[in-house]
């Protein structure tokens, strides 16, 4: 199988310049080159590194894992290929929080999600069902928890 790199060098250079400009405005360390962006895109295997969806012939974005506003560096090691949906949903969230959201929403543990879990010491767990369709025992009139369930709050890294 012969693979042909169809990434436009001019567009990559423009994208790198835009990322570098944004990083400069945030006083973030690091400077990216078009070659580093190309390498990150090719390393992703054509999938969103957050949710795992295919990005072949689809729109994609490069996302800082730890956002520049949170002190993240403008380096290739802090970049992932992301679908527009994941990039928008992540926004300025801490990567550990977003990785947990991805895992809860999709059930997937991409290599990036697992790397973030490992980095921040997160043990993924499945939450027990709270709705009657998933837990018919909660529907029973003699259930002592009936009407007493409250939302759970979590502490996330700042």
Which residue ranges define each predicted feature?
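Short, charged surface segments at domain edges that flank catalytic/cofactor-binding sites
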Residues: 3-50, 113-122
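Short, charged low-complexity linear motifs
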Residues: 2-3, 83
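Histidine-centered nuclease catalytic patch
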Residues: 50-81, 90-102
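Short, mixed-charge, low-aromatic patches
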Residues: 35-41, 55, 72-73, 155-158
